[in-house]
Regions:
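Juxtamembrane/disordered regions of integral membrane proteins
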Residues: 1-157
């Protein structure tokens, strides 16, 4: 019988997800600084906590912390999926697809519940695409790290 957390998969998922969250954060911040997008990761992360992210250093720090927490949560979910459901074959592709699944959930089904600003969701192709690509990168990075942390492995007991 497979059991989750036999080999520390929970905490490894937390670590992988938080680190991959930093990768996603960096990607979205770069796009925002370059003027490709209007909204940065703080806008999406803080949308879960409050209706609108206020300007300032405090909001930036809180947004970064929220990104780590959200990344850690999804990292545990992805770790669980790879431990119980998916095989190790093509783990990067599967991680990418799981990231796209997160995008569909967060910005399709739960966008209103998370309080994302309408102008973010209607901000044009660049905005929506950058969020999609950011979460695809997040999923791939999480899978990559889970492989390095030996959560994703060829044989299961």
């Amino acid at each position: 019988v497979l059991a989750f957390d036999d080999r520390g998969e929970f905490l490894k998922g937390v670590y992988a997800g938080a680190i991959a969250g930093m990768v996603r954060y960096s990607f979205r911040e770069i796009l925002q600084v370059l003027g490709v997008t209007q909204f940065d990761t703080n806008s999406t992360s803080l949308g879960v906590l409050m209706n609108q992210a206020p300007p300032g250093l405090g909001a930036t720090v809180l947004g970064f912390i929220a990104t780590l927490i959200i990344g850690a949560f999804w990292g545990v979910v992805i770790s669980f999926v790879f431990t119980i459901v998916l095989s190790h074959e093509q783990y990067l592709l599967k991680g990418t697809l799981l990231g796209i699944g997160i995008w569909l959930f967060e910005f399709g089904f739960a966008a209103e519940a998370f309080g994302y600003p309408p102008e973010m969701l209607n901000g044009g192709l660049a905005e929506v695409t950058s969020i999609l690509v950011g979460l695809a990168i997040y999923g791939a990075a999480t899978a990559f790290l889970l492989k390095r942390f030996e959560v994703i492995r060829p044989s299961r007991p």
